[in-house]
Amino acid sequence: MKWSEIRFWGILFGFLLGALPLLAQDALPEKSRPDCHSGHVSDSEAMQQLMRFVEVSNPMPASFKGTTENTIIDPTHELEPFWQKLSVLDRPLRIVHIGDSHVRGHVYPYIVRRQLEDDFGREAVLDMQVSYRTSGLAQETGAAGIVYHIVGVNGATCASFATPENIRQIIELNPDLVILSFGTNEAHGRRYSSAEHLAQMDNLLGELKKGCPQAVYLLTTPPGAYVRNGRRGARVINPRTKLVVKTELDYAASRELAVWDMYHVVGGERYACLNWSNGNYFQRDKIHFTQDGYILQGLLLHEAIIKSYNNYVETQLDGTWN
């Protein structure tokens, strides 16, 4: 894959020096196209200084089939308080990204973190190397800016993550935005139950909201994965992923939560796994991803975040936010 922005090599050089192999992180059974968002700018100089559009590129590989628009689904504007804080950015603005091994590997969320720091400044945190060996927690300086914490657990589901220790850690980080990336391990449960999954998400979100009333929440759907057809059978596309994604989307809609539907963005039931596989983004287990695969996922989430932020800025400048 050809990267048009040279800065990624600098970002990743330090990461790669300390990174461990990303194989088998879960305890499981086994070019850029312009996408710069511009719009009407107010004549008010103060408003222009406060509200600015952020340039972002589309990292989606041209070879990917069946993709959909890369946006955050948020019809009730649940993320508006976060966008407002981001537009002002007069203090440390804290994002906590939690999830399974896709998050624990640190590459995927670290790319989002570094991109947002490039967009909004990195003065709020110490410039420390992050790798699989290190903590994903940022070290704050006290200055205003983005603080992006990474808290992943190998093999985690919504149910297993919701321990008192994990909840307490998230609460102590005092987040303004919590990103929840689960679903891969739920989909590997051969007795998957949508009703149980809904209850587990409700429990986790309930505990987080109780301890972090100031935060807003963004769900993400899993990228897709393969599963063995029998103990020694060939790997086939996991048929339960689509059920997990539907459950997560239904839950987000019923609870008025924002969601980034990565699964359908990269091709959905028909193409997601084929796109990852044909682009050599899967590791051998076809559950976890290569370095490039996780980089791409991070770039896609970053693009979706910036597009939503730019939409907020545009509507504020035009006075059309409803």
Where are these regions (language model features)?
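Bacterial N-terminal signal peptides
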Residues: 10-19
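Sec/Tat signal peptide C-region and signal peptidase I cleavage site
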Residues: 20-24
